[in-house]
């Protein structure tokens, strides 16, 4: 024991002691103590609930090291499994589906795919709606999956169909508002080919000729008014075993022989008026064609 400690101990023992000394308690007592315990208990309960909610959210959302739920973060990008809903616009560079499943895009109203340039301007748009599918771009192309050749292309100047055959199955056929250029028009086997213009003219032109062929059927040309066959530099050639001209008018012929009018006429002579009109005249010993016939005079 040191000297200082000894002096302090002897001094404390020599101090007079009072019998009625008052003691003051040190600490938190009463309602303050109860409030402190209540807040500590409330904080503990909050921590437990918070921890339980965190564990429940991690369990429900399926948080892992690779991602969250159906969302997986890989080196190549983000991978989604199952059905995913996007409430806001989605900006991506490429969208791929799995090798064993298709890619399905679904919306309650429509599906719109936009393409923009580096300045943010809209360069192409594809909209799939409930009533129509609209494509807005400079050029629209449909290519074959095998060799990549263009099956259909459309732009402001022309529409090109690259398929081997264009088949129209509608009952009204194909309606063209303007001219059509094609090297070959044919119908399906055992079907009729019909070219019709209900309110205007139908014109077929070709610099090296127009050929109409019906190998196993008839060829009919019907019109309401006049049918013109015109050759400016050549000739009109009719070649068939039998050539029939029906509904030709019959001209009158005055004969001095009374027997010709009484007998039934079965043979007629084909006559031509100066204006080119054909008519029939009763055949006789000589020619019965007359330029003064009523057919030529009234034509």
Curated annotation (Swiss-Prot):
GO CC, any one term: Golgi membrane
What ranges does the Extracellular topological domain annotation cover? Answer: 59-299
Its primary localisation, in coarse terms, equals membrane
InterPro entries cross-referenced by the UniProt entry: Sarcoglycan (IPR006875), Sarcoglycan_gamma/delta/zeta (IPR039972)
Q: How does it sit in the membrane?
A: Single-pass type II membrane protein
According to the UniProt topology, which residue ranges lie Cytoplasmic?
A: 1-37
Judging by the UniProt lineage, the source's domain of life is Eukaryota
Q: Where are the bilayer-spanning segments?
A: 38-58
Annotated compartments: Cell membrane, Sarcolemma; Cytoplasm, Cytoskeleton
Q: Which family does it belong to?
A: Belongs to the sarcoglycan beta/delta/gamma/zeta family.
Please give the name of this protein: Zeta-sarcoglycan
């Amino acid at each position: 024991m040191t000297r200082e400690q000894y002096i302090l101990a002897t001094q404390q023992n020599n101090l007079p002691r009072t019998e009625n000394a008052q003691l003051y308690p040190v600490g938190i007592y009463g309602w303050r103590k109860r409030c402190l315990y209540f807040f500590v208990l409330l904080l503990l309960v909050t921590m437990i609930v918070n921890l339980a909610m965190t564990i429940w959210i991690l369990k429900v959302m399926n948080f892992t090291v690779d991602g969250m739920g159906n969302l997986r973060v890989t080196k190549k990008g983000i991978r989604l499994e199952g059905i995913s809903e996007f409430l806001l616009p989605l900006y991506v560079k490429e969208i791929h589906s799995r090798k064993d499943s298709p890619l399905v895009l679904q919306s309650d109203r429509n599906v719109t795919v936009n393409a923009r340039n580096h300045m943010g301007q809209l360069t192409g748009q594809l909209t799939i709606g409930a009533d129509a599918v609209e494509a807005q771009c400079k050029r629209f192309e449909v290519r074959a999956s095998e060799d990549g050749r263009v099956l259909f292309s459309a732009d402001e100047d022309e529409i090109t169909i690259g398929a081997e055959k264009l088949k129209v199955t509608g009952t009204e056929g194909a309606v063209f508002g303007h001219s059509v250029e094609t090297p070959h028009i044919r119908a399906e086997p055992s079907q009729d080919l019909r070219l019709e213009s209900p309110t205007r003219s139908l014109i077929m032109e070709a610099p090296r000729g127009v050929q109409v062929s019906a190998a196993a059927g008839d060829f009919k040309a019907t019109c309401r008014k006049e049918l013109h066959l015109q050759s400016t530099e050549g000739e009109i050639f009719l070649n068939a075993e039998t050539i029939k001209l029906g509904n030709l008018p019959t001209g009158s012929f005055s004969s001095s022989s009374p027997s010709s009018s009484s007998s039934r006429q079965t043979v007629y002579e084909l006559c031509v008026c100066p204006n080119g009109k054909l008519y029939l005249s009763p055949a006789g010993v000589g020619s019965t064609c007359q330029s003064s016939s009523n057919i030529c005079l009234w034509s």
